Amino acid sequence: MASTTFSSAFSILSLPSSSPSPPPSPPRTLPVANRRRRAAAVASTATESPKVLELGDAIAGLTLEEARNLVDHLQERLCVSAASFPPAAAGLRAAAVEEAPVEQTEFDVVIEEVPSSARIATIKIVRALTNLALKEAKDLIEGLPKKLKEAVSKDEAEEAKKQLEGVGAKVSIA
């Protein structure tokens, strides 16, 4: 089958197309530096069969219209279509999303509830943690739940929670 596909593909390359088309444009040439890189790449494929190298050279010499015609012919011949192949970039993006779980680095300390017996002790702790004046600390405690600290490190949030729970307040870290 490989030889049949090879001979069919090669015969298409050598036959002119039946549809009228504009005259083929002259083939583009590579600058000397690019030719050297290409020559090095071709030299590394010297272990491949001569058929493969000959076919590769023939395909590389095609114009864009001839290449499009070759692709159409091979899709018909092999019963495949470009739509049957999923885009490669979509799979890479999905993998990248799964690999990088976002780790939270900033936390908010929220005072949920303060029993009436622990209000004075809680106000003292709030003043020590935030450097608020007495009136602002009292106002903070009255309209709960409220954020005591925003965007702090995990250690600082845990320490504040520990101190506030020590005097009887209910605290959460978000």
Curated annotation (Swiss-Prot):
<dbReference type="Pfam" id="PF00542">
    <property type="entry name" value="Ribosomal_L12"/>
</dbReference>
<keyword id="KW-0150">Chloroplast</keyword>
<feature type="transit peptide" description="Chloroplast">
    <location>
        <begin position="1"/>
        <end position="45"/>
    </location>
</feature>
<dbReference type="GO" id="GO:0006412">
    <property type="term" value="P:translation"/>
</dbReference>
<dbReference type="GO" id="GO:0003735">
    <property type="term" value="F:structural constituent of ribosome"/>
</dbReference>
<keyword id="KW-0689">Ribosomal protein</keyword>
<feature type="compositionally biased region" description="Pro residues">
    <location>
        <begin position="19"/>
        <end position="29"/>
    </location>
</feature>
<dbReference type="GO" id="GO:0005840">
    <property type="term" value="C:ribosome"/>
</dbReference>
<protein>
    <recommendedName>
        <fullName>Large ribosomal subunit protein bL12cz</fullName>
    </recommendedName>
</protein>
<keyword id="KW-0934">Plastid</keyword>
<feature type="compositionally biased region" description="Low complexity">
    <location>
        <begin position="7"/>
        <end position="18"/>
    </location>
</feature>
<dbReference type="InterPro" id="IPR008932">
    <property type="entry name" value="Ribosomal_bL12_oligo"/>
</dbReference>
<dbReference type="Pfam" id="PF16320">
    <property type="entry name" value="Ribosomal_L12_N"/>
</dbReference>
<dbReference type="GO" id="GO:0009507">
    <property type="term" value="C:chloroplast"/>
</dbReference>
<comment type="similarity">
    <text>Belongs to the bacterial ribosomal protein bL12 family.</text>
</comment>
<dbReference type="GO" id="GO:1990904">
    <property type="term" value="C:ribonucleoprotein complex"/>
</dbReference>
<keyword id="KW-0687">Ribonucleoprotein</keyword>
<dbReference type="InterPro" id="IPR000206">
    <property type="entry name" value="Ribosomal_bL12"/>
</dbReference>
<dbReference type="GO" id="GO:0003729">
    <property type="term" value="F:mRNA binding"/>
</dbReference>
<dbReference type="InterPro" id="IPR013823">
    <property type="entry name" value="Ribosomal_bL12_C"/>
</dbReference>
<feature type="region of interest" description="Disordered">
    <location>
        <begin position="1"/>
        <end position="46"/>
    </location>
</feature>
<keyword id="KW-0809">Transit peptide</keyword>
<dbReference type="InterPro" id="IPR014719">
    <property type="entry name" value="Ribosomal_bL12_C/ClpS-like"/>
</dbReference>
<dbReference type="InterPro" id="IPR036235">
    <property type="entry name" value="Ribosomal_bL12_oligo_N_sf"/>
</dbReference>
